[in-house]
Amino acid sequence: MAQMYFYYSAMNAGKSTTLLQSSFNYQERGMTPVIFTAALDDRYGIGKVSSRIGLQAEAQLFKADTNLYQEIAALNEVEKRHCILVDECQFLSKEQVYQLTEVVDKLHIPVLCYGLRTDFLGELFEGSKYLLSWADKLVELKTICHCGRKANMVIRTDEHGNAIKEGDQVAIGGNDRYVSVCRQHYKEALGK
């Protein structure tokens, strides 16, 4: 029975690495997965999912207006798809998360989503909010703070390494802009 999974974490926990390993596992069994990633995240090239350890794969892009159910149904008509893998799923809209539930429930294809739970202000992303609500399985991937505790928050920094306390929810960046920390160090960095 197909299910929808949400693998979430702070940055640098290996979400993309885990996604790429899952894709490889399906391919190794002669099955056909399809990978999607957010069009707005082009840090490693357009239409690519890349991990910090050097793994990479081609991906279909989703934009704010992409109907994922229609896209996946069309791909599945051409060639049976055994799994849908979605990177940067925090950027999905409520409607797109619903469309992915339809992929699971009507097309009977498992959907594995990988993304951040919260932004640099500790607020849920829209996609993450509805994945937390509607996914069949929730899996937290763990990373560590500089103090050794579990990191579950993300700090956005300026060019001098100072924590930023306001701004747009989405600002694409990697280790140069974001630091994963525990809640205590998050509060200290923001002066809370």
From Swiss-Prot:
The active site is at 88 (proton acceptor). It comes from the Bacteria. GO terms for molecular function: ATP binding; thymidine kinase activity; zinc ion binding. NCBIfam families: PRK04296.1-5. Pfam families: TK. It catalyses: thymidine + ATP = dTMP + ADP + H(+). It is an enzyme of class 2 (transferase). ATP binds at residues 9-16, 87-90. Homotetramer. Its EC number is 2.7.1.21. GO terms for cellular component: cytosol. Belongs to the thymidine kinase family. It is found in: Cytoplasm. SUPFAM superfamilies: Glucocorticoid receptor-like (DNA-binding domain), P-loop containing nucleoside triphosphate hydrolases. Keywords: ATP-binding, Cytoplasm, DNA synthesis, Kinase, Metal-binding, Nucleotide-binding, Transferase, Zinc. This is Thymidine kinase. GO terms for biological process: DNA biosynthetic process; thymidine metabolic process. It comes from Vibrio vulnificus (strain YJ016). Zn(2+) binds at residues 145, 147, 182, 185.
